[in-house]
Regions:
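RNA pseudouridine synthases
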Residues: 2-302
């Protein structure tokens, strides 16, 4: 299962503004006001945790002079590392597409506290190593604590084609989810609701089918028909049971593993137009479920 899951609850935010007439280097300002060492200040700059708050840009140069600008520091409480793809993370690759596995706790793209500890950076480094001259961008997103497959393209045309398939809901997504509780009253659910996020309410639709039970865990196949923020987690909390390890919508302890996996996609290949299916079931999930096969073994329970 995934490792520790950083979150905004594990981040400290500081604002620094020098007094009128004061001037010092950025590194010195960080050391003085955050009471850090020179090495710690350099690490904050290197990992992208320091911002010019008014211009909304990251600051890197510890030797630059700061005077009256408002500085913002988003300091994580956990240790960061510069992300790189590991052997076996690439689950599909051809001349047009790259599909990689994201572990739980790994951001898909830069966060306020870092632009070095994310999947996008790992893919960009992979492109550079392979001589692929294209600026990578994730085509789909996954929640920070969730695991699963993330799409990247290798040129603008294929990226636009895949983005369009996702926007028109022509990509079939299949998830696995696990809970500790399940009433068993019914084996399938059609969950419709309006979900609010940051002041906006949008319709959400999720299909859920009970799959199997093993060792006190109940596993479900999940087919989201829309892509709202935290949609699956919120729908499970409301209609089925909170997901195992869900800190936000359940009773998971801080740092717990969220049992939510995007394991399969079916789509039209942007070059050939052929129906293509890519799936991946990590070994910990396979073991927890009683070692099913990705295809036949993951049919809903009858």
């Amino acid at each position: 299962m995934p490792g520790p899951q950083p979150s905004y609850q594990n981040m400290e935010r500081f604002f620094i503004r020098l007094k009128a007439g004061q001037s010092m280097t950025l590194s010195a300002a960080l050391q003085k006001h955050l009471r850090t060492t020179a090495e710690e200040a350099e690490q904050l700059l290197r990992q992208g945790s320091v911002w010019d708050s008014e211009r909304k840009v990251r600051l890197r140069d510890g030797g630059m002079a700061v005077t009256g600008q408002l500085l913002r520091v988003d300091r994580p409480k956990f240790k960061l590392r510069e992300f790189a793809l590991e052997e076996g993370d690439v689950k599909y690759e051809d001349e047009q597409l790259l599909i990689v596995y994201k572990r739980g706790g790994v951001p898909v793209q830069p966060t306020p506290y870092s632009d070095t500890d994310n999947l996008l950076l790992g893919v960009q480094k992979y492109y550079e190593e392979k001589g692929i001259r294209y600026r990578a961008a994730p085509i789909n997103r996954l929640d920070l604590p969730a695991q699963g497959l993330v799409f990247f393209a290798k040129d603008k045309t294929d990226e636009a084609a895949m983005n369009r398939q996702f926007q028109l809901h022509r990509v079939r997504k299949r998830y696995l989810a696990a809970t500790r509780a399940f009433s068993g009253v019914k084996s399938s659910y059609i969950i419709r609701s309006d979900l609010e996020w940051q002041g906006s309410r949008k319709a959400a639709l999720t299909y859920v089918r009970f799959c199997r039970e093993n060792a006190g865990r109940f596993f479900f196949l999940v087919f989201p028909q829309t892509g709202r923020t935290h949609q699956i987690r919120r729908h499970f909390q409301a209609e089925v049971a909170p997901l195992l390890g869900d800190v936000r919508y359940g009773q998971g302890a801080p740092g717990a593993d969220l049992w939510l996996l995007c394991f399969c996609y079916s789509f039209r290949h942007p070059a050939s137009g052929k129906k293509t299916t890519v799936s991946f079931l990590p070994d910990p999930w396979r073991a927890a479920m009683g070692k099913p096969e990705v295809g036949a073994g993951l049919r809903p329970a009858r």
